[in-house]
Amino acid sequence: MLLKRETLRKIYYLLNSVGAITVLLLVIKALGFIKVRIIAQLFGTSRELDIFWAAFTIPDTIFNVLVAGAINAAIIPVFTKFLHTDADKLRDIFKRLTIVYSLFFIIVSILLFIFANQIGSWLIGADNLHKYLGTSNVADAQNIEMFAGIMRVMIISPILLGISSLMGAYLQAHKRFFTATLAPLLYNLGMILGSLILVKYFNLGIYGIAWAVVIASLFHLVVQIPEFRHLYKGSGDALHVKFMRLFSNLFSKDILGVFKLALPRIIGLLGEQVNVIVNTVISF
């Protein structure tokens, strides 16, 4: 009888959790639609908005290919495996992955910041491609400068989302799905509020949307920190790391194993994102 009650309690808890997450997912979809509608209402079918979406393609591609592709395909399964076999190794892998991704994104962000104008010339000012295709290209030097400025604002976004996604994977490995699901909801909410406030009240124009992306990415990260810290401290490990020890063997066998698992998914997503970039080039 006691066993039956315990089973029923677990089923009840599971159904409640599934129900709450389902509602969250519906709200996320609704907010995503509202976000796009608000941005469209603020700028209509303007050239500025086209340039924003083109600039957004670059950080979005970096995040989707290198982080989003690896999370479900490799990182969560590896975290879950070591959670049940070697909790110390799980924490070690988390630290190393965080350092690897952070360093990579910082280096890429610096390069994107330096070569933003050249990327803009290639992406929205591809005159040779348009001549080959027989299409017109109306992107001028001012458009390319705007593209570069918008992209420079948004390049911090993949760093924030990368760390946030690793935290989300850590939470999901511990079966804490609610907070991990709450993060994209806060992202959409940050985009909506940031766009309205920065564009309408601070008169930042299209750059207000770019800063809204950064604010939304920060929301995505911050909402997960309290529960992540609680789980991490509860494991008996401190959040600080001995960086020299980690750097001495940063790409350990386990870290390389994560990227090996993620590689097929990364290649698949890369193909999809190349298609998006090509469509962006042609559309200009």
Regions found by a protein language model. Give the residues of each.
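Membrane-embedded alpha-helical bundles of multi-pass transporters/translocases
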Residues: 2-284
